[in-house]
């Protein structure tokens, strides 16, 4: 109830003068804010703004489309800039993600990598057994200098052998719900310990109450993974469910 209370406060008492010194406000992940939150932002910060985001990274329906209601809040003279070139991902990853979201107008930066693979398994345990086999992380924690040295050595070996086999610093198992993430974490904990993996230092469950982020294998949900980057990612979703809302969750992951 905090946002309705804040809205009533600013409507009744006016704007806090401590914000008057702010000349320009930058809002990121614009798709994650509601209409009420934007109304509060407008009252709190009567200054120029730059609002950034990815419209496709939302689980809301068309009635909550930020692009649709922002002009009604900030005025019709707002300037809209659409950035259609993607630099972050490889062509293979970006093409796969855009297909999930039905995006066709994006220009992809010419950078290639391994293609995205989709595999089906009878259940979560079998899927995570495959994750353990394909995971490319050091089993024990190492210093940053040691990690750089090992990566260089692995890359030199891979180059000599014509392969791309080397260890990563970070990896993630991304699920749909918090319960699925918790279940996956405990399954992975047992299976990785059996493989000699230092799970205390190299395995973590990232949730809403987490206070730190460490290297190694992170298990989390698609909505907690937003804004984070990993060297290797395993997205574990129910294969039979291809509904629009689940496809959007896959895109975000």
Residue ranges and their predicted role:
Residues 1-5, 135:
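Coupling/switch/interface segments within P-loop NTPase motor domains and analogous charged loops
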Residues 6-7, 93:
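Low-complexity/IDR signal
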Residues 12-24, 31-252:
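Conserved helicase motor core of SF1/SF2 NTP-dependent helicases
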